[in-house]
């Protein structure tokens, strides 16, 4: 277990907490076919939906600073929730730069080009070759290839990581074809390796996976395949191995060597962090590296503070976030999740800041060590609930944020039976949390960061492992000691809201002033037809 807290924290005694419960990947879709949420056993959520103020809110596209019709994701969702405003996300920021042909005006890339123009080293472009838009975008890679040609960089090796998680499970060839076409048009570059994201993009310190990817990129003794990408993928599919799990394979003799440069074009940091650490840290100790070439590493965005890398698109600072407002009011807050979502309720929700805020305590519950989460659909939800109930019972935290990873992580496997079990587990845990909150007279705001588990099969009959653009539920369970001034229980939630409105809603419940920079609006509005009975008497909830 990992517990940490900020220094200089205030202390409340006997606090009625406000508990933000984020159901990661719990979207709304009316059709029950291929819908793990509709088919799962959810008596608690169904009862809450009918008894308390609720709404469907938006968690994708322009509502969270992404292009229209772009599915939301956990990083963007938690950042938007914490910021209380719509932020131009990195996908849009980088896409605009590529579209406007402005990569050559990016200082880190200018320096990189000058270095390679004066040296014999190779530029290695490493990242997820995908049009999913969650961690990267293939258009960015194609733009980099054209930029390299225009900058006079002669030797370019592309190390393509295949997706199959944020895209259909057998769709890699479409993106690879786009990259091959870009290299032909630019007259520079070749495909040096292929590797499924399962190996190259682990974020849970499963170093045996990362080691396989690292060896692929750096070990000169590894054999080179004489098959084309099309042949390799067809052979993989025939063996039941989809894009996400594609085994690492070298396609040329271009490995990373002393004096080479590496540009990691994933813009989302959480799944780029481990492979970047292996490439740039002298004191890396996750596994024993067979070779340690001296590389000049550039990342598209800040992967981690204090890494010895250049950053092409440095973070744009954010102020007056939810956590900051709570901390500045002298209130204590508690953030908890299991390993897979821990960075989201901490780092991402705090606007990319690693260190806890004053009065912020963090608690990490380890995720189970399994190959894929369909093998353990309950994940660590029960242990996570236990720890959160302990925090509620302490009576010292004004704001508690908890993330349940199951709908998203099990939804990504595409295994329907496992996903319905995951949904039932989370529903049961919500009931347990609700009892604890009710004992304290607190309030729960239940929502999700994006959709996933409500769609488990695509129109082509393949397992649907990606997120969705569906709206997500938001339910306000108001407690006796957190009644809103002037409203009592006579409230409802707006139907036109989005994730940017969650923080203003929480601040209203906490009776804290919303800062001007937080441009979202509280979802709460007065109405006269809500059951006025207290939380403890509203309905018997199954646990």
Swiss-Prot record:
Signal peptide: none annotated. GO terms for molecular function: manganese ion binding; phosphoglycerate mutase activity. The keyword Membrane does not apply. The keyword Glycoprotein does not apply. Its EC number is 5.4.2.12. Monomer. This is 2,3-bisphosphoglycerate-independent phosphoglycerate mutase. The gene is gpmI.
């Amino acid at each position: 277990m990992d517990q940490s807290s900020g220094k200089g924290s205030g202390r409340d005694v006997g606090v009625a907490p406000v508990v933000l419960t984020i159901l990661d990947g719990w979207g709304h879709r009316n059709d029950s076919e291929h819908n793990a949420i509709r088919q799962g056993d959810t008596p608690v959520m169904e009862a809450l939906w009918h008894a308390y103020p609720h709404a469907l809110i938006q968690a994708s596209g322009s509502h969270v600073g992404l292009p229209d019709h772009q599915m939301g994701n956990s990083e963007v969702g938690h950042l938007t929730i914490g910021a209380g405003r719509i932020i131009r996300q990195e996908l849009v920021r980088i896409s605009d730069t590529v579209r406007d042909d402005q990569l050559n005006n990016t200082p880190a890339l200018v320096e990189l080009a000058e270095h390679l123009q004066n040296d014999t080293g190779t530029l290695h472009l490493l990242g997820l070759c995908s049009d999913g838009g969650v961690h990267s975008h293939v258009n960015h890679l194609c733009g980099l290839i054209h930029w390299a040609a225009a900058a006079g960089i002669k030797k370019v090796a592309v190390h393509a990581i295949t997706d199959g998680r944020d895209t259909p499970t057998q769709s890699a060839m479409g993106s690879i074809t786009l990259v091959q076409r870009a290299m032909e048009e630019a007259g520079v570059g070749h495909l040096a390796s292929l590797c499924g994201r399962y190996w190259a993009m682990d974020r849970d310190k499963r170093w045996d996976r990362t080691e396989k990817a690292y060896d692929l990129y750096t070990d000169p003794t590894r054999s080179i395949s004489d098959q084309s990408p099309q042949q390799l993928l067809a052979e993989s599919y025939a063996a039941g191995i989809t894009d996400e799990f594609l085994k690492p394979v070298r396609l040329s003799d271009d490995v990373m060597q002393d004096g080479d440069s590496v540009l990691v074009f994933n813009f989302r940091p959480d799944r780029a962090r481990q492979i970047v650490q292996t490439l740039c840290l002298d004191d890396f100790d996750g596994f024993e590296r067979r070779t340690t070439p001296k590389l000049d590493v550039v990342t598209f965005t800040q992967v981690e503070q204090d890494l010895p890398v250049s950053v092409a698109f440095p973070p744009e600072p954010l102020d007056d976030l939810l956590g900051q407002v709570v901390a500045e009011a002298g209130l204590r807050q508690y953030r908890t999740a299991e390993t897979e979502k821990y960075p989201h309720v901490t780092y991402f929700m705090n606007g990319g800041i690693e260190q806890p805020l004053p009065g912020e305590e963090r608690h990490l519950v380890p995720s189970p060590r399994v190959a894929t989460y369909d093998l353990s659909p309950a994940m660590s939800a029960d242990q996570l609930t236990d720890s959160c109930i302990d925090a509620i019972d302490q009576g010292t935290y004004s704001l508690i944020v908890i993330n349940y990873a199951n709908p998203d992580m099990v939804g990504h496997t595409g295994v329907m039976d496992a996903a319905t079990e995951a949904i039932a587990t989370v529903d049961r845990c919500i009931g347990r949390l609700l009892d604890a909150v009710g004992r304290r007279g607190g309030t729960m705001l239940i929502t999700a960061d994006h959709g996933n588990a409500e769609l488990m099969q695509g129109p082509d009959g393949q397992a649907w492992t990606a997120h969705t653009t569906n709206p997500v539920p938001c339910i306000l369970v108001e407690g006796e000691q957190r009644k809103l001034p002037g409203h009592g229980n006579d409230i409802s939630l707006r139907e036109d809201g989005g994730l940017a409105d969650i923080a203003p809603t929480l601040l209203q419940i906490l009776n804290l002033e919303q800062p001007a920079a937080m441009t979202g609006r509280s979802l709460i509005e007065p109405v006269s037809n809500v059951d006025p009975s207290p939380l403890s008497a509203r309905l018997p909830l199954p646990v």
